[in-house]
Structures are given as C-alpha cells and as structure tokens.
A protein has these predicted regions:
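Extreme N-terminal starter segment of soluble prokaryotic enzymes
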Residues: 1-4
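Rossmann-like dinucleotide-binding core of oxidoreductases
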Residues: 6-12, 16-36, 124-126, 131-232
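Beta1-alpha1 glycine-rich phosphate/pyrophosphate-binding loop at the start
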Residues: 6-90, 198-207
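Short low-complexity, flexible loop/linker segments enriched in glycine and/or proline
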Residues: 43-45, 108-109, 209-213
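Flavin (FAD/FMN) cofactor-binding and adjacent substrate-gating region
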Residues: 46-62, 110-114, 148, 229-232
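Structural signal for conserved beta-strand scaffold positions within catalytic alpha/beta enzyme cores
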Residues: 57, 95, 101, 154-157, ...
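Residue-level detector of flexible, active-site-proximal loop/helix-junction positions
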Residues: 62, 100, 106, 159-162, ...
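Feature captures the FAD/FMN-dependent oxidoreductase FAD-binding
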Residues: 69-139
Length: 232
C-alpha cells in the first residue's frame, strides 16, 4: 500500500480521492478552505455547465435526471456534496489546511522516486510516495497593466459576481473562453452595451440542436463549422 497526498478538494480532488482509494492506496487530502467544491463555491452567479449533465458527471454517480440539462452552480455544489457523502470521502480531507511546501526526498534515482516531503500550514511535515496537485488554475488573476490608456473600471472574471458589479457600464469583455462568453451573455441580457474582443475568430453555436446537447450528436462532427452553423 502506498501513501499519497492530494492537494485540493474541488471536483478533481474528490475524483482523485475516490480513484486512489479504489486502487488500494492510503490518502491524505488537504483543503485550504472549509468546504469542498473549489471555485464552484465563489464564482459568478451565472456559472453553469457548458457540457450536459449526461457527459459531465463522475463515473458510477450520474446526476439526477430531473436536474436541468446544463446544471447551475448551485446544482453542481450539491452534486459534489452528494458524491462525497456517497463514497465517504470527507474523512480523508483535512480542511482549513494549506500545503505550503513540497519537495522530493533525496535519492540517487529519478526525482520523486524516493517519495516527497510535504509541509502544511499547521507546521506538520509529512512524507508521501506521491503528490497529486488538484488545486485548480483559477485562483491567480492576471490583469495586464496598460498605464495611461484606460481609466475605467476593470473587473477580472475571477472577481465578478453578478450584474451589480458592472451596472450602468459600457462593457468590453476581453477573451472568448468559457468565462468570457458567460460574462458577455450576462451583461447583454441586462441590456448593457456589450462588446467582446478575441485573439482569433470563433464559431459561436447553440448548446443544443433540436433539444439535444451538441456534445451528444457525434454526427455533427462530420460537418464543417460553417455547415454546423447553418444546421444550428
């Protein structure tokens, strides 16, 4: 039996705990907050899945059939809690404890082959056979500094909560990723003058086709983007 450290109790962390336990390993998971679910706890109010519940759920634990096709953030948080309870994952999680330092143990072999030393915010140092990092990639916000050009309000998607943050503003959304598109739609639905800029061209299409999620229609991939636009 090997002993592993998992950093973070968001969706990836929870799935990793179960997978490692199923493989017969001993697990310690450290979560710096007091809740599971990661960024789903504090992201913008309009956050929802962009893939359908049928293809997004954890293996062996489908989402309830009566839920919306593209569940809202609140549904997802409930789902994570149900998943953790169903497989008794919480007892492997230490909350309010951050991992502050990770380094490989000394060895003449490949890095990490002798194990890893992990120090947590409670000052305890532990050793593990491996470390799985599941702390997410949305915590650090990158806002470019362009002095002397724009003096208006700047809001990063990681800080945006709802339309109250930009009420009455003329809105420019930079980027066409998932968050960018969500926020552009949020602003437009509030009747704000909304524009979106992107590095390269994109094809924006409905999430459903005749009531079916596009991700479930394999035959759609046989068509070009232009043909898909016409069909949609």
């Amino acid at each position: 039996m090997n002993r592993y450290c998992i950093i973070g109790a968001g969706p990836a962390g929870l799935a990793s705990i179960k997978a490692m336990l199923d493989a017969g390993h001993e697990i310690d998971c450290f979560e710096k907050s007091d809740v599971i679910g990661g960024h789903w706890n504090h992201d913008y109010d309009a956050l929802h899945l962009i893939t359908s519940r049928q293809v997004t759920g954890f293996p062996e634990f489908p989402m309830p059939e009566h839920w919306p096709l593209f569940p809202h953030r609140d549904h997802m948080l409930e789902y994570f809690h149900l998943y953790a309870e169903a497989f008794d994952l919480r007892r492997h999680i230490t909350f309010n404890t951050a991992v502050e330092h990770v380094e490989p143990l000394p060895t003449d072999g490949p890095v990490g082959s002798a194990g890893w030393s992990v120090r947590t915010s409670d000052g305890v140092q532990r050793e593990y056979d491996g470390v799985l990092v599941a702390n997410g990639h949305l915590r650090d916000q990158k806002i470019p500094e362009v002095p002397g050009i724009f003096t208006g309000k700047q809001v990063h998607s990681g800080s945006y909560r709802n339309i109250d943050d930009i009420d009455g503003c003329r809105v420019l959304v930079i980027g066409s990723g998932n968050s960018g598109c969500d926020l552009a739609v949020d602003a437009a639905q509030a009747r704000l003058d909304t524009h979106i800029v992107m590095r390269r061209g994109h094809h924006f299409q409905p999430k459903t086709f005749f009531g079916k999620p596009r991700s479930e229609l394999a035959w759609m991939q046989e068509f070009s983007f232009e043909e898909q636009d016409l069909l949609a």
